[in-house]
Amino acid sequence: MDKEWLEVCIYTSSEALEAISGILYNTGVKGVSIEDPKDIEFKRKHPGDWDYFDETLLKVKDTAIVKGYYKEDDKFNEYLDYIKKSVSNLDQFGIDKGEGLVEVHKVNEEDWENNWKKYYKPTKVSNKIVIKPIWENYDKKQEEIIVELDPGMAFGTGTHETTRMCINALEKYIKEDRTVFDIGCGSGILSIAAAKLGAKHVIGVDLDPVAVKSSKENIKYNNLDNIEILEGNLMEVVEGRANIVVANIIADVIIFLTEGVKAFIEKGGYFIASGIINSRKEDVIKKLEETGFIIEEVREEGEWACIVSKIN
């Protein structure tokens, strides 16, 4: 394997991180890393929630950064033009692209394969759940539940506001003998948290085969046998109903899925929807109510909202 790679750095806002990651995945990217200052700020404000953290990381500037790694071939300039144009157009979709600066650097393979790990330390994200990277040690407290995670470079650290709100909602609404469906399971973090919080059976689905593989690997790290991970669309690959459906995606996808999701939720069950930027919160609430959901609560953290609704 070549030892020298091209690193594309996009300087942006926390709001645009997922959108820009999606842009990179539409190209020939070999790896993606995310540096979100809001993760660092969360750790700064919750010093008791992590076991150890490199003080130098607390000096990270306010700009969020997405880095994509490419081989230098004849397609790279085409990819770069696509990235620049797509980032520039984010404003048209109501997404704050922040600085929107795109830079290219040459880097060694060893640098980008491991540097992203320094941003990821054990973090307590709810009353019970601690997200722990598999390469870190952590002294578990009696009441804590440890989620072992190797997100890989394709996924966030699990400490993003949207993930934290989902986990806190799962902690509140999961009871024993409950079934949970996780739409867009990514690294599997919500599926694993649901199982460890007492769900009897969990099904996670994702359209991305990389996510499916990552979820399955993380389930093995946690020694769980009550989680099923499927590749595809919820409506096409899952049968039956759940007591809770959780989706940490984006507002437009949640709005699109709402009518279909209703058929997969038991009477009295909950739909936990996050990944919703605050400016789109009312649009999601309107669609949920039009579809027959009752809004149970709206959680907000930073620029993001998590909406918990119920089917009676």
Curated annotation (Swiss-Prot):
List the keywords (alphabetical). Cytoplasm, Methyltransferase, S-adenosyl-L-methionine, Transferase
Extract the GO molecular function terms from the UniProt entry. protein methyltransferase activity; protein-lysine N-methyltransferase activity
Q: Name one GO biological process term.
A: methylation
Q: What is its main location?
A: cytoplasm
What is the E.C. number?
A: 2.1.1.-
What reaction(s) does this enzyme catalyze? L-lysyl-[protein] + 3 S-adenosyl-L-methionine = N(6),N(6),N(6)-trimethyl-L-lysyl-[protein] + 3 S-adenosyl-L-homocysteine + 3 H(+)
In terms of InterPro entries, this protein maps to: Ribosomal_L11_MeTrfase_PrmA, Ribosomal_PrmA_MeTrfase, SAM-dependent_MTases_sf
Query: Is the keyword Transmembrane helix assigned to this protein?
Result: no
Q: What class of enzyme is it?
A: transferase
CDD domains given for it?
AdoMet_MTases (cd02440)
Reading the lineage from the top rank, the first entry is Bacteria
Q: What does the UniProt entry say about where the protein is found? A: Cytoplasm
Cellular component per GO, a single term? cytoplasm
Which residues does the record give as S-adenosyl-L-methionine binding sites?
T163, G184, D206, N248
| Family that this chain belongs to | Belongs to the methyltransferase superfamily. PrmA family.
Record's function text: Methylates ribosomal protein L11.
Record PANTHER family: ELECTRON TRANSFER FLAVOPROTEIN BETA SUBUNIT LYSINE METHYLTRANSFERASE (PTHR43648:SF1)
Q: What is this protein called?
A: Ribosomal protein L11 methyltransferase
Organism from which the protein derives: Clostridium botulinum (strain Hall / ATCC 3502 / NCTC 13319 / Type A)
Its organism's taxonomic lineage begins at: Bacteria, Bacillati, Bacillota, Clostridia, Eubacteriales
